[in-house]
């Protein structure tokens, strides 16, 4: 945000997210962006602001939705969002995700991931509410360090010998085929809310 790293200024449901993970949006209800100095709000963090990711939680409205997609570079995408009420004030929600595919214009690079996010809610539409929810994400990727910008329009380096270099093919892969990025992330959250009055929770 405005030239500052937000690595330590990213929150999930109001809790600081310290994991270095490329997060998927399959289980997000909304993204809140707060701009400006926010030290009095969140404590230590970037002076540019912070980001809060809000997870999907159960509601009393029964609903099923999903997405299915296929794109270039053999990209495939599948998501499902299932919400089911269990009583007058409790509900269950399940979000699922599966993604596979290569990267456009790049050889060798592949990305694969899946995610499961169950959630339970009790006391919905009452003064006291309890939410129990978790998320499991697994990623199996081949890391891509990109390509050299030598020879591209606008490239400049104080070393004249580099300026004379030829442009490389964007399909070239400069990593190792045996390299891997194997990520497994689990989160479990308990949220308790109680309405003290009409304006205070």
Regions flagged by a language model, labelled:
Residues 99-104, 111-195, 199-201:
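Acidic/polar loop-and-plug regions of large Gram-negative outer-membrane beta-barrel proteins
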């Amino acid at each position: 945000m405005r030239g500052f790293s937000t690595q330590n200024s990213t929150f999930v449901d109001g809790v600081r997210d310290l994991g270095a993970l490329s997060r998927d949006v399959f289980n997000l209800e909304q993204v809140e962006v707060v701009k400006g100095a926010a030290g009095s709000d969140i404590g230590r963090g970037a002076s540019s602001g912070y980001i809060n990711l809000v997870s999907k939680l159960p509601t009393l409205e029964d609903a099923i939705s999903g997405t299915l997609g296929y794109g270039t570079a053999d990209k495939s995408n599948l998501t499902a969002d299932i919400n089911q009420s269990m009583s007058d004030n409790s509900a269950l929600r399940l979000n699922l995700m599966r993604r596979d595919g290569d990267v456009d214009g790049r050889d060798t690079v592949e990305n694969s991931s899946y995610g499961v996010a169950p959630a339970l809610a009790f006391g919905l539409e009452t003064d006291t509410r309890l939410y129990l929810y978790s998320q499991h994400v697994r990623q199996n990727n081949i890391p891509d360090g990109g390509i050299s910008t030598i020879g591209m329009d606008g490239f400049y380096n104080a070393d004249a010998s580099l300026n004379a270099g030829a442009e490389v093919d964007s399909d070239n892969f400069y990593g190792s085929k045996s390299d891997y990025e194997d990520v497994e992330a689990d989160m479990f959250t308990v949220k308790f809310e109680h309405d003290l009055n009409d304006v205070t929770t």
